[in-house]
Amino acid sequence: MRRLFPALVLLLAALAYFELAWAPFYAFPPPEPFRGEHWYNPYAGYRGGGLLANFHAHSEAWGGLTFGNTPRHELHAMYEKRGYDVIGISDYMSLSPSEGSDGEIYVSSYEHGFTPGRHHHTVIGADHVTWFDYPLGGSTRQKQDVIDELRASAPFLVVNHPTKAQSFSISDLEQLTGYDAVEVATKYGVWDDFWDAALSAGRPVWGMAADDGHAQTETDPGSHLGIGAVVIHTQERTRDGVLRALREGRFHSLYTRQNEGPIALELCEIEGGQLHVRVGEDASVIRFYGPHGDLRHQVTGRPEASYALGADDPYVRVEVIAHGAVLYLNPVLRWDGVALPKPTARVLLGTTWAVRIAGALAVAALTWLAARALRPGSQGTALAAPSGVRNST
């Protein structure tokens, strides 16, 4: 026990160093509303149709530890039977191989993260798994460091289920940069308030619905198969075409919590300063939201609605509810007509390395003390086990 105690202290010190001292310190861009004389409309020219896709679902993997209970090929076949064009089986830290026919549009996806705090992301389009993570940490700077690591290999990166285990806060999404989308609706709930927080802070991120199912079946009424999906607005049936449309926000999300039928989007256009939306049926309500989720306008019982875009609208997004289902449109944003803003958290190199060096010196000192305590013939040091845990003779 006398030799084990110093080694345990050293191990805990090394873990504390990685969790507390290694993550960079950042200067996060302050909140800044979207600005510009032009409106970026990801739906300009859209007249219906698209590729039906899901990127977040779990099969039987890792010996059942992740609670998926359906073999991957069977789950893939279920989505294929429902007419999905793009099927992403996002098992934890495991790329989903192609399971479909030769005509399948294969876009890889996996869920990154193995932390108790569930700070997870769906990584779409990567060619390998990134294993870097902070197993215990949940600070904003640790989350930003993980995003930066994932960004190097992730063509499209989604922040998952923000309130599951309190994995992300409103403040996190207002500060973090480098992610492309936030899950707005899955079996775990709805997070349009987190989405609005990010948009209100000037983060040009899109909203994505998904199943996130772990127990998927065709017959079980409790299955989450098909409750969340995206319709991608592209005629390119290729990986690159899908990823390009995702990055540009050219998709809309469908959330059918009780497996209601989908809502068909027909158009979303800006003409004469009016944002005009039309769907294929009379909607229960069509709502137009501005910053911080402020309800700007709504129309009930009609298949279409318009809203006059104001000078004080940095962005406007639309939700359509019909027969219990919800259609989420990505926002129209003010921009300069050239490129959407790309806020980027800046690493504070001086602070980062000062803390890393100080932490390394502290671990080195503990290593020296532990080595003394473990040296044969040592009479004990500050790191020796307390007398209460030594064996009596």
Regions found by a protein language model. Name each.
Residues 15-177, 183-201, 208-220, 329:
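A metal-dependent hydrolase metal-coordination microenvironment
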